[in-house]
Every structure is written in structure tokens, then in C-alpha cells.
């Protein structure tokens, strides 16, 4: 399963995709690496997305606010990798996500 996330500072929308078909969607608190630490992100995932831990997530595309440089992207990358157990990650800005959605 692939997860695609569109994150702002107040909420994150997550969507499962399997075999090219969009599946279930989830809403969690927003993730902005300027305001949330990596440990805070992992706690948030555990509290708000427990059903996705161990659910066979093979790849994640994360587009978010605050992902403005490599060090901020690395914070998000490490948290996602730790919680979901995959290293197949794309981390980009919310602006890139908006452009790709067109």
C-alpha cells in the first residue's frame, strides 16, 4: 500500500492507494517540522493513525508545510520511516504537492 499525505499546520489528509486505486482516507493533526519534533510526530502517528502501523505501507509521498529545506525534510523522513517501517519516502513541500495535483 502507498500512502499520500497533504499536510498543513492544522491538519494532514492521508490517502491509501493500492494497485492504482484510491482507498480509505484519514485526517490527523497537522505536521510542520518548524513546530513539531520528530518524536512529537511519532507520538502523533501512534495516537491518531494507530490502524496504519504494521498495515503494510510500502511507500509514502508526504507533501507538507514547513518542508522548506533538507534538514526539515529529514525530520519528517525519520519520523515517517520510524513509525511506518519503510524507507521508500518522498518528502516535498505543500506547494509541490499542490502543483502535482493539477
Language model segments and positions:
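Short glycine-rich, Thr/Ser-proximal phosphate-binding strand/loop in the N-terminal lobe
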Residues: 2-43, 56
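A generic local secondary-structure boundary/capping motif
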Residues: 4, 101-102
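General beta-strand structural signal in soluble alpha/beta enzymes
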Residues: 5, 88-94
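Residue-level signature of transmembrane alpha-helix interfaces in integral membrane proteins
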Residues: 22, 45, 77-79
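Short amphipathic alpha-helix with an adjacent loop that forms part of the alpha/beta core around
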Residues: 42-52
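Short beta-strand-loop/turn "lid" adjacent to the catalytic site in phosphate-handling enzymes
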Residues: 50-90, 102
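Short alpha-helix plus adjacent loop in nuclease-associated cores
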Residues: 96-100
